Amino acid sequence: MRECISIHVGQAGVQIGNACWELYCLEHGIQPDGQMPSDKTIGGGDDSFNTFFSETGAGKHVPRAVFVDLEPTVIDEVRTGTYRQLFHPEQLISGKEDAANNYARGHYTIGKEIIDLVLDRVRKLADQCTGLQGFLVFHSFGGGTGSGFTSLLMERLSVDYGKKSKLEFSIYPAPQVSTAVVEPYNSILTTHTTLEHSDCAFMVDNEAIYDICRRNLDIERPTYTNLNRLMSQIVSSITASLRFDGALNVDLTEFQTNLVPYPRIHFPLATYAPVISAEKAYHEQLSVAEITNACFEPANQMVKCDPRHGKYMACCLLYRGDVVPKDVNAAIATIKTKRTIQFVDWCPTGFKVGINYQPPTVVPGGDLAKVQRAVCMLSNTTAVAEAWARLDHKFDLMYAKRAFVHWYVGEGMEEGEFSEAREDMAALEKDYEEVGADSAEGDDEGDEY
């Protein structure tokens, strides 16, 4: 089996975790108490969903997941919520005092008290796996736990499980709206620390999802529940190939092989289509060509940046539902003729396709319409550098005046770590710039063809 362990860190991670596991349960027909009425084989069934759920002797399905937060309130909601019977109590780990939006608290002071307990739980989950494939880590960049504790955890996971892939789903600070003043500090510190430990990080920014909810679903004032449900659809599409059988299945390592041209350039953009409300879906025929086109619209992306200014290095299209390869090939051929979509010159083919016959499931009473087919596009584009540049600029403005730095130093960090992290980010921006530059400039390599 190719099992995956999900680790949800901090408030953002835990709440996205709630949305994701709710959706997985609906997709697999697992009830909130972990029973699966349709499943006849109790015990070691090697159905695909066993990559995400382990089965007890009593026929109960338990998520292979750990929820961690340094303060109790958010995890207490899981402990008392609808799915409280789904999780083993030891999978829900909460501390006593939170990281107070402070990377240093999450990484050094408070984080180190709880890290061994967390690794212990992860080890227990890993021991139940026959062939652990890797970890999915959900967190935000801006929070103290999400940034500080995640980076500590990633470092330790690299030590304990060196070769296993680690994928991140990170909530990137939105350009306009902000949940914390020190977000730029936390984001840059955590990116610097986890850069060498993470194999692939899917970034999502809240503002982009707000706009999608407002524009496509006509929700005037989207709540975090709306955002998380939309996000869980994306996570579900990315992991669908691990949980269901399909025509072209994609596993975790396959993503990395196809999306990450250089180890540092591992921040693909996610785009999902169709995001459409039930009233509208009733009147629309969403063909494969239409939803594929929608993926290349900047408006449907999960991070605010404009790929029309950047170049694509690689692109994964993950279809699910009623989709046949012929339609996909036709849709991709059409896209390749469009001049607005530019690939770097050293990557001529650029499209990887996965097809899964399980149609997308929606949460009853949610905002998304039930559709026959959907697609999630993961693209590695140089436009992500815009997002980094924006963040670096905010960091510079604050750091020039050393604003708020004393909170970090007071928790045992050194000021040198800030400048070191900032230099690393500058290098990352430079890397993106170089990757996008044409390879044949100035030298006569073109003669061989």
Curated annotation (Swiss-Prot):
Give one GO biological process term. Answer: microtubule cytoskeleton organization
- Phosphotyrosine occurs at which residues? Y432
Acidic residues biased stretches: 431-449
Its keywords, alphabetically, are: Acetylation, Cytoplasm, Cytoskeleton, GTP-binding, Hydrolase, Magnesium, Metal-binding, Methylation, Microtubule, Nitration, Nucleotide-binding, Phosphoprotein
Into which EC class is this enzyme placed? hydrolase
Name any cofactors this protein relies on. Mg(2+)
Q: Reaction catalysed by this chain?
A: GTP + H2O = GDP + phosphate + H(+)
Q: Where is this region: Disordered?
A: 429-449
> Which regions span the lipid bilayer?
none
Compartment annotation: Cytoplasm, Cytoskeleton
Is Endoplasmic reticulum tagged as a keyword?
no
Q: Which domain of life is it from?
A: Eukaryota
Question: Where is GTP annotated to bind?
Answer: Q11, E71, S140, G144, T145, T179, N206, N228
Q: Where is this protein primarily located?
A: cytoplasm
Assembly and interaction partners: Dimer of alpha and beta chains. A typical microtubule is a hollow water-filled tube with an outer diameter of 25 nm and an inner diameter of 15 nM. Alpha-beta heterodimers associate head-to-tail to form protofilaments running lengthwise along the microtubule wall with the beta-tubulin subunit facing the microtubule plus end conferring a structural polarity. Microtubules usually have 13 protofilaments but different protofilament numbers can be found in some organisms and specialized cells.
What does the UniProt record say this protein does?
A: Tubulin is the major constituent of microtubules, a cylinder consisting of laterally associated linear protofilaments composed of alpha- and beta-tubulin heterodimers. Microtubules grow by the addition of GTP-tubulin dimers to the microtubule end, where a stabilizing cap forms. Below the cap, tubulin dimers are in GDP-bound state, owing to GTPase activity of alpha-tubulin.
In Swiss-Prot or TrEMBL terms, this protein is called: Tubulin alpha-1C chain
In its UniProt entry, the species of origin is given as Bos taurus (Bovine)
Its encoding gene is what?
TUBA1C
